[in-house]
């Protein structure tokens, strides 16, 4: 009988009810001691390990669990410490300061992890002295052993780690070579401690320019072979297809491939004989990035095909389960949709069902999952017809004409100031919202509280001297979840949390049916805020691309169709705001760049679809209505022309953590629309200085026409404390006032 093994690439850190987040934030707030934090996180790590053991995984990952980010863990492991933080003991407090900044130093850059909604802390190579300095990975491996867990260590590989880092005078190849002896030292320590194999994550090898890394990749793994450790290494790739013939030629013990998000290419390579059968194939057959239950019968067929071309097969999720919630156990969902879902724990159950079927000829669990999937598929969630053709996809007039009408209507000063949208969600705000959702207070009591909070912050903004105000979004838990709760076709879970960055957790809605706008979503709060001031108040919406990218999308319709359905719904809300007298409407697209496919052959169509959806949502307004949008920082060079094609009157972009890198993207384009490049980092509690903001403005004005430039923070201010926000915005406005006098 042919046998298979099961494994996992990583498990969610958050805990079922965000225990991880709550403990870390309590430590930051000095509500618990370091000893209490360590105990809570140790208990949670233990729970994760034993849960995976319960589902009979043959090997369980360690090194995926972290206090903030696994890339930052690797930086500290190799003493890659930002120059401004050097000279301190390498401990958890240093880790938190690098990630969040402190009163003296800015945080390291925060960038999307490939095309996911997870963010990593960018390693900085300026004036570093790499060495093995904090081998937490070894400690966690030994801890798993103490629990009698058959664990394998996980570490990001040298090619990926260096490619995702910045700074330093060495070339890419030189940095990799610098790290090789250090990786060897870590590998040897783990093997000596009993590791049967080590998972080396190299997702950079599925990207477009992976072929340019092949020489240094071969040199690196040849080095590990000469050191006697290569056969203990398993190179894991995910999120796209890999160059299998090249990977198979490397002297490692196993290769991991994604058979879900590869568009079928990896199986074709296997069937073409590109896989070296002397190695173990780690097949990512269960979707690690979406929440839908697997077609378990199709997975059985895939395993049969793979077994025909391999001698040793391990099945696993397509990527780390970091990207999905922990468990469905605490949810109370409608059966019609709930039967079609599978979170991290349920995905382990799917692996176990396939293991039992192939190894023990036990089909009980397999048959149960198969019947459940078939019941879900027999339902119809395609019920609506859409008239996409009747909605405008371009503004009535060019920007040069629109801006004249908008300026006449708004009468804004030189270098207008604004914020991105949200203000602090205090404990009181969260309590009122929770009490209202759980029917512990009346609608009237909740509405009164919201109005009081809106009025208070309108006055704060006026007192500070901002030019374009916002209502603060106190009614919203999350910028996507809020719309998921109000639009038809979405399901919002109770505990479906996933990690975005650090302790920031989001609860992505699940798109299961046709999307439709049925009633105003934001009009009441925005109109009320506008009634309190003579200054313009922005309507605040989330764009169709971001709603789709930050949701768990349905897989029974083409992505473009779902995206355009959302665009039509947002268009209805835009028009409702305009009809209510709102002069400035912001439609945020922070996730437009992150959804860009990893392979350039798919870029043009993705960007074309994204631009069309945004314009479908925003083009029906009159010329005098000003459309804003916002995007989070990433490598914008690839999409700068698409950003221009959105034809938004004003775009604000998160830039401060890039330390000026993003400004370079504007050197090759004459950006002739309104733009605000964020002048301070909202992810850090640190208050910027007037000089820092002035420097950021001056740097931006080297590339941006002053008449088009806006001044704003990097992003929404929801996660900051009230006093931090007031102090930082006061500094911002004072810097702008001084600049206007020049």
Swiss-Prot record:
<dbReference type="InterPro" id="IPR038071">
    <property type="entry name" value="UROD/MetE-like_sf"/>
</dbReference>
<feature type="binding site">
    <location>
        <position position="550"/>
    </location>
    <ligand>
        <name>5-methyltetrahydropteroyltri-L-glutamate</name>
    </ligand>
</feature>
<feature type="binding site">
    <location>
        <begin position="18"/>
        <end position="21"/>
    </location>
    <ligand>
        <name>5-methyltetrahydropteroyltri-L-glutamate</name>
    </ligand>
</feature>
<feature type="binding site">
    <location>
        <position position="588"/>
    </location>
    <ligand>
        <name>L-methionine</name>
    </ligand>
</feature>
<protein>
    <recommendedName>
        <fullName>5-methyltetrahydropteroyltriglutamate--homocysteine methyltransferase</fullName>
        <ecNumber>2.1.1.14</ecNumber>
    </recommendedName>
</protein>
<dbReference type="InterPro" id="IPR002629">
    <property type="entry name" value="Met_Synth_C/arc"/>
</dbReference>
<feature type="binding site">
    <location>
        <position position="473"/>
    </location>
    <ligand>
        <name>L-homocysteine</name>
    </ligand>
</feature>
<feature type="binding site">
    <location>
        <position position="112"/>
    </location>
    <ligand>
        <name>5-methyltetrahydropteroyltri-L-glutamate</name>
    </ligand>
</feature>
<keyword id="KW-0486">Methionine biosynthesis</keyword>
<comment type="function">
    <text>Catalyzes the transfer of a methyl group from 5-methyltetrahydrofolate to homocysteine resulting in methionine formation.</text>
</comment>
<feature type="active site" description="Proton donor">
    <location>
        <position position="683"/>
    </location>
</feature>
<feature type="binding site">
    <location>
        <position position="630"/>
    </location>
    <ligand>
        <name>Zn(2+)</name>
    </ligand>
</feature>
<feature type="binding site">
    <location>
        <begin position="420"/>
        <end position="422"/>
    </location>
    <ligand>
        <name>L-methionine</name>
    </ligand>
</feature>
<comment type="similarity">
    <text>Belongs to the vitamin-B12 independent methionine synthase family.</text>
</comment>
<dbReference type="GO" id="GO:0009086">
    <property type="term" value="P:methionine biosynthetic process"/>
</dbReference>
<keyword id="KW-0808">Transferase</keyword>
<keyword id="KW-0028">Amino-acid biosynthesis</keyword>
<keyword id="KW-0677">Repeat</keyword>
<comment type="pathway">
    <text>Amino-acid biosynthesis; L-methionine biosynthesis via de novo pathway; L-methionine from L-homocysteine (MetE route): step 1/1.</text>
</comment>
<feature type="binding site">
    <location>
        <position position="588"/>
    </location>
    <ligand>
        <name>L-homocysteine</name>
    </ligand>
</feature>
<feature type="binding site">
    <location>
        <position position="715"/>
    </location>
    <ligand>
        <name>Zn(2+)</name>
    </ligand>
</feature>
<keyword id="KW-0479">Metal-binding</keyword>
<dbReference type="GO" id="GO:0008270">
    <property type="term" value="F:zinc ion binding"/>
</dbReference>
<feature type="binding site">
    <location>
        <position position="632"/>
    </location>
    <ligand>
        <name>Zn(2+)</name>
    </ligand>
</feature>
<dbReference type="Pfam" id="PF08267">
    <property type="entry name" value="Meth_synt_1"/>
</dbReference>
<feature type="binding site">
    <location>
        <position position="654"/>
    </location>
    <ligand>
        <name>Zn(2+)</name>
    </ligand>
</feature>
<dbReference type="GO" id="GO:0032259">
    <property type="term" value="P:methylation"/>
</dbReference>
<dbReference type="InterPro" id="IPR006276">
    <property type="entry name" value="Cobalamin-indep_Met_synthase"/>
</dbReference>
<dbReference type="InterPro" id="IPR013215">
    <property type="entry name" value="Cbl-indep_Met_Synth_N"/>
</dbReference>
<feature type="binding site">
    <location>
        <position position="473"/>
    </location>
    <ligand>
        <name>L-methionine</name>
    </ligand>
</feature>
<dbReference type="Pfam" id="PF01717">
    <property type="entry name" value="Meth_synt_2"/>
</dbReference>
<feature type="binding site">
    <location>
        <position position="594"/>
    </location>
    <ligand>
        <name>5-methyltetrahydropteroyltri-L-glutamate</name>
    </ligand>
</feature>
<dbReference type="GO" id="GO:0003871">
    <property type="term" value="F:5-methyltetrahydropteroyltriglutamate-homocysteine S-methyltransferase activity"/>
</dbReference>
<keyword id="KW-0862">Zinc</keyword>
<feature type="binding site">
    <location>
        <begin position="420"/>
        <end position="422"/>
    </location>
    <ligand>
        <name>L-homocysteine</name>
    </ligand>
</feature>
<keyword id="KW-0489">Methyltransferase</keyword>
């Amino acid at each position: 009988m042919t046998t298979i093994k099961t494994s996992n690439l990583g498990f969610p850190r958050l805990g079922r009810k965000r225990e991880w987040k709550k403990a870390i934030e309590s430590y930051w707030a000095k509500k618990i001691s370091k000893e209490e934090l360590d105990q809570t996180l140790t208990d949670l790590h233990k729970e994760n390990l034993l849960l995976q053991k319960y589902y009979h995984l043959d090997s369980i990952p360690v090194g995926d669990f972290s206090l903030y980010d696994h890339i930052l863990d690797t930086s500290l492991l190799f003493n890659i410490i930002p120059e401004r933080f050097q000279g301190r003991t390498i401990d958890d407090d240093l880790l938190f300061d690098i990630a969040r900044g402190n009163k003296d130093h800015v945080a390291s850059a925060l960038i999307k992890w490939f095309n996911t909604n997870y963010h990593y802390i960018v390693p900085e190579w300026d004036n570093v002295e790499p060495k093995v300095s904090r081998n937490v990975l070894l400690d966690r491996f030994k801890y798993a052993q103490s629990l009698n867990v058959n664990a394998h260590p996980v570490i990001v590989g040298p090619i990926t780690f260096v490619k995702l880092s910045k700074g330093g005078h060495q070339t890419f190849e030189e940095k990799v070579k610098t790290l090789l002896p250090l990786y060897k030292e870590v590998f040897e320590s783990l093997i000596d401690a009993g590791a049967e194999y080590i998972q080396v994550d190299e997702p950079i090898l599925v990207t477009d320019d992976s072929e340019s890394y092949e020489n240094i990749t071969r040199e690196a793994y040849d080095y590990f072979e000469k050191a006697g450790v290569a056969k203990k290494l398993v190179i894991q790739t995910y999120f796209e297809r890999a160059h299998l013939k090249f990977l198979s030629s490397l002297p490692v013990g196993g290769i991991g491939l994604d058979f879900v998000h590869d568009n079928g290419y990896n199986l074709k390579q296997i069937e073409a004989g590109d896989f070296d059968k002397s190695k173990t194939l780690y097949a990512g057959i269960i979707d690690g990035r979406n929440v839908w239950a697997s077609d378990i019968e199709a997975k059985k067929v895939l395993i049969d095909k793979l077994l025909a071309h391999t001698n040793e097969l391990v099945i696993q999720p397509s990527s780390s389960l970091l990207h999905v919630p922990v468990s469905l156990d605490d949810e109370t969902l409608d059966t019609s949709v709930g039967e079609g879902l599978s979170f991290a724990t349920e995905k382990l159950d799917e692996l176990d069902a396939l293991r039992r079927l192939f190894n023990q000829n036990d089909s009980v669990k397999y048959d149960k999952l198969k019947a459940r999937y078939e019941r879900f598929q027999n339902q119809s969630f395609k019920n609506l017809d859409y008239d996409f053709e009747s909605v405008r996809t371009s503004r009535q007039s060019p920007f040069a004409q629109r801006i004249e009408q908008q300026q006449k209507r708004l009468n804004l000063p030189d270098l207008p100031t604004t914020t991105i949208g949200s203000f602090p969600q205090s404990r009181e705000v969260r309590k009122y919202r929770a009490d209202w959702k759980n029917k512990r207070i009346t609608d009237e009591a909740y509405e009164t509280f919201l109005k009081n909070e809106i009025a208070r912050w309108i006055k704060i903004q006026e007192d500070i001297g901002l030019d374009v105000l916002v209502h603060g979004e106190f009614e919203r838990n999350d910028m996507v979840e809020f719309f998921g709760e109000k639009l038809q076709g979405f399901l919002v879970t109770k505990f479906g949390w996933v990690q975005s960055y650090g302790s920031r957790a989001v609860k992505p809605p699940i798109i299961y049916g046709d999307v439709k706008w049925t009633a105003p979503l934001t009009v009441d709060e925005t109109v009320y805020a506008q009634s309190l001031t003579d200054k313009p108040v922005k309507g605040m919406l989330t764009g169709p691309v971001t709603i789709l990218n930050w949701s768990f999308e349905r897989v029974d319709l083409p992505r473009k169709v779902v995206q355009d359905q959302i665009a039509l719904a947002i268009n209805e809300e835009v028009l409702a705001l305009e009809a209510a007298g709102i002069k400035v409407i912001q439609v945020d697209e922070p996730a437009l760049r992150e959804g860009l496919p990893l392979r350039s052959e798919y870029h043009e169509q993705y960007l074309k679809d994204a631009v069309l959806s945004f314009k479908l949502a925003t083009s029906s307004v009159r010329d005098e209505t000003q459309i804003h949008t916002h995007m989070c920082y990433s490598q914008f060079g690839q999409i700068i022309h698409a950003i221009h094609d959105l034809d938004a009157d004003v775009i604000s972009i998160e830039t401060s953590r890039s330390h000026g890198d993003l400004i370079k993207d504007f050197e090759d384009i004459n950006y002739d629309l309104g733009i605000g490049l964020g002048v301070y980092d909202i992810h850090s509690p640190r208050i910027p200085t007037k000089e820092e903001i002035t420097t950021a403005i001056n740097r931006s004005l080297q590339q941006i026409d002053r008449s088009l430039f806006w001044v704003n923070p990097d992003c929404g201010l929801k996660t900051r404390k009230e006093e931090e926000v007031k102090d930082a915005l006061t500094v911002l406005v004072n810097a702008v006032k001084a600049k206007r006098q020049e």
